[in-house]
C-alpha cells in the first residue's frame, strides 16, 4: 500500500446534500470505525444528519444502496471483506463492488465505494481510519460521493439553464 496518487483528504462544501450510508455488520470493529469516519467526513462537509443503515454483509449493500439512492443525493457503501481459505472472497468482493457501481449508473446517484478488500485483518485495520491507520477509506469514500454529487448538481443546473456542461 503506497497511497501514491491519492488526493488530499479534503472537505467539500456539501450543505444541502442528502447522504445515505449503508454499512455491513461483518468485521464490526473495522466497519464501525469506517462508519464513524464517514459520519465525521459528512459533518466536516456540512452534511449534519446522514442516514445510516446497517446490513448483514457486503452482498446486501447494493440493494440497500439502491433504495437509499432513490431518496438521497449521494450514497456510501462500507464493508470489510477479508480473504479466507476459499474463493468466496473473490465472489463477494466482486459482486458487492459491481453492485454499487450498477446502482450509481442506473440511478445517476453517486455511490462511494468504501468496501475494503483485504488479504488480512491487519490490512483492514490499516485502512479503516483508526488513529494508527495509514488510510481512512470511510472518509475518502464519503468525500468522493459528496464531491460527485456536487459535480452532478452543477452539471444538471447548467443543463436546466440551457448552458453547456
From Swiss-Prot:
Enzyme Commission designation: 2.5.1.78
GO biological process: riboflavin biosynthetic process
Protein's pathway: Cofactor biosynthesis; riboflavin biosynthesis; riboflavin from 2-hydroxy-3-oxobutyl phosphate and 5-amino-6-(D-ribitylamino)uracil: step 1/2
InterPro entries for the chain: LS, LS/RS, LS/RS_sf
Binding-site residues, 5-amino-6-(D-ribitylamino)uracil: 26, 58-60, 80-82, 113
Residues reported in the UniProt entry to bind (2S)-2-hydroxy-3-oxobutyl phosphate: 85-86, 127
Active-site residues, record numbering mapped to chain: 88 (proton donor)
Top-level taxon in the UniProt lineage: Bacteria
GO CC field: cytosol; riboflavin synthase complex
Keyword Iron in annotation: no
GO molecular function: 6,7-dimethyl-8-ribityllumazine synthase activity
NCBIfam families: lumazine-synth
Protein name, as recorded: 6,7-dimethyl-8-ribityllumazine synthase
